[in-house]
Curated annotation (Swiss-Prot):
It is an enzyme of class 2 (transferase). Methyltransferase which mediates trimethylation of cytochrome c (CYC1). The gene is CTM1. This is Cytochrome c lysine N-methyltransferase 1. Residues 184-288 are annotated as: SET-like.
Length: 551
């Protein structure tokens, strides 16, 4: 294929890129017989080279390729190299906080637009953009972000994605030499194609000690980026780096497959990670593989609807949304698919125990219960905490502080940049009659860890609250009609996945089955959490000010 020639890729006989079952493309073994006997004893005899790629695109080598134009195209090359340096150099400050993958998207956009404006750009990069990044339709979250924010407004991940897209677009418009209003749809296309294809490639820092000195770099690897992801039971290949040449190589793994027994058109599949994150898959690729049982781990995370948490108070008194804000508790649940193909709540996470804290209220109301107070008691505690009891105008200092924390309470931000002085607890666990702040949370957490009776009572109260939430959320999801998001696959896939998981959890509750993983396997305590939402800026910060401190 033309792209292989342009990008210096070598493809083994019997291998081809073809349409896959999800509407995209994959790499297939169309003629297994062509691979029989191709294993090289010098490589250990347990693998066959299917693909070798010399041209890899990442931030570093895109910069190098554009700088190299100075010596390749005389004046045109110098002009293009200077323009690229100018655009990127002036963009660094605006893009200092974005990920390296976002920078890769930005570099690709700049190179593409420079080519459109008549600047000399490297042919292989230009062809890759035209053929792959612009020629691949990926119905992932970035291509339907408006609909995703309508249906999942409460999920911080999609606000973060939207903010990244807006930041890249705004920077692009302001830095390109032609002040055209470049379409954000073009950016979304390149963004969606890039994030769905990017691979984490290890890069050597010091040749003499490679294993201890390398970084993982988000990279686009032509042809290899057509290879799809499989679980541990279907994976039959893996990629590696040729340390001597720097090439990326795709190997057929002969420890798991025998090419002589493969059927024609067997798909080549690699495993990216041991953790299969349904939400991440839908966000990046626009689809979620079916349930399966593997030696890996499949998870699904969802964020509570914060309006529900605020309007449906626990015990008719505790505003769960407000409580989670003040204690900076991530308002998300993580579900794990166990070996019996059942979705269960991951209660091994430290953050899950923090979710339980507001529910650690005795039903008898005589042992311990939470109290919210933003009046004189809160004022006293704030003044003591900030040591501002000797200011000239204490009333004015308190008024300013109260205005600020009230603004945060009503904002969409999940984290509060103040100590939780408005929340106190009356408890027989404490020597004092009343305590407050993060120390208070630690006391309750310690009691939860060391009192099985209290833990059971707390989880029961949490489950009762969750059961009502499930009824509410399932009703919302079941009102969804696919026509609402026609051709926006990521939205419909995410709704279907969340609905499926929540229905299974509710069924377990109705059948008096445990909904908790209750595993002693330490790997479950380290699974990744969803990000928290912190996108609104306080009105007392001007546009040029640094973001407020959330620590």
């Amino acid at each position: 294929m033309e792209l292989a020639n342009i990008c210096n890729a070598t493809i083994a006989k019997g291998i081809a890129v073809q349409k896959d079952s999800y509407g995209g493309y994959g790499v297939y073994i169309v003629d297994p017989g062509a691979l029989v006997g191709c294993n090289d004893p010098k490589l250990g005899g347990d693998k066959i080279e299917l693909l070798r790629v010399s041209s890899v695109f990442n931030v570093k080598n895109l910069m190098e390729a554009m700088n190299a134009l100075e010596g390749e195209y005389a004046e045109d090359g110098q002009r293009a190299a200077d323009m690229f340096k100018s655009i990127i150099g002036s963009s660094i400050e605006e893009l200092s906080a974005v990920s390296e993958t976002c920078l890769l998207v930005y570099f690709m956009m700049v190179i593409y637009l420079m080519g459109e404006q008549g600047y000399a750009v490297p042919m292989k990069i230009s062809r890759y953009i035209d053929t792959v990044l612009l020629g691949t339709t990926v119905n992932n979250a970035s291509n339907c972000i408006e609909s995703m924010l309508i249906h999942y407004e409460h999920v911080a991940l999609f606000h973060e994605l939207d903010n990244n897209l807006q930041k890249l677009h705004k920077t692009l418009i302001s830095k390109m030499p032609s002040k055209k209003n470049y379409s954000i749809e073009l950016l979304r296309q390149i963004y969606s194609a890039t994030v769905s294809r990017v691979l984490e490639i290890p890069q050597e820092l010091h040749e003499e000690n490679y294993m201890d000195n390398y970084v993982v770099t988000p990279s686009l690897v032509p042809i290899l980026d057509y290879v799809n992801h499989g679980d541990k039971t279907s994976r039959n290949a893996y990629y590696d780096v040729d340390r001597r040449k720097g090439d990326i190589i795709l190997y057929l793994d002969l420890t798991v497959v025998n090419p002589g027994k493969l059927k024609p058109n067997t798909e080549v599949l690699i495993t990216y990670k041991d953790i299969e994150d349904s939400l991440a898959m839908i966000t990046k690729y626009g689809f979620d593989p079916a349930n399966y049982t593997t030696t890996g781990t499949k998870i699904f995370s969802c964020t509570f609807d914060k309006m529900y948490l605020s309007t449906n108070k626990f015990d008719n008194e505790i505003d769960i949304r407000n409580f989670y804000q003040w204690f900076s508790i991530n308002p998300s649940l993580q579900f794990v698919l166990n070996s019996e193909n059942e979705w269960l709540i991951n209660d091994s996470l430290a953050e899950f125990e923090r979710l339980l804290v507001p529910f650690a209220t005795s039903s008898q109301r005589n042992e311990h219960y939470w109290i919210y107070s933003d009046g004189d008691d809160a004022r006293k505690r704030f003044m003591e905490y900030f040591d501002i009891d000797e200011v000239e105008d204490e009333d004015e200092a308190w008024a300013q502080l109260e205005t600020q924390f009230k603004w945060f309470e009503s904002s969409e931000n999940d984290l509060m940049p103040f100590p939780p002085c408005v929340w106190t607890v009356k408890s027989k666990f404490l020597k004092e009659k009343e305590a407050t702040g993060y120390e208070l949370e630690k006391v309750i957490q310690n009691k939860l860890e060391n009192s099985r009776a209290l833990y059971n009572e707390t989880t029961n109260q949490f489950q009762a609250y969750l059961e009502n939430y499930l009824d509410y959320r399932i009703d919302v999801l079941q009102e969804y009609s696919p026509e609402d998001t026609e051709n926006e696959n990521a939205v419909s896939q995410l709704i279907a996945r969340e609905l499926s998981v929540l229905l299974k959890i509710r069924d377990r509750i109705n059948n008096n089955k445990s909904i908790f993983l209750n595993s002693e396997d330490k790997k479950y305590a380290k699974l990744p959490l969803l990000p928290t939402k912190n996108v609104e800026r306080p009105p007392w910060l001007s546009e040029g000010d640094d973001d407020f401190d959330q620590d």
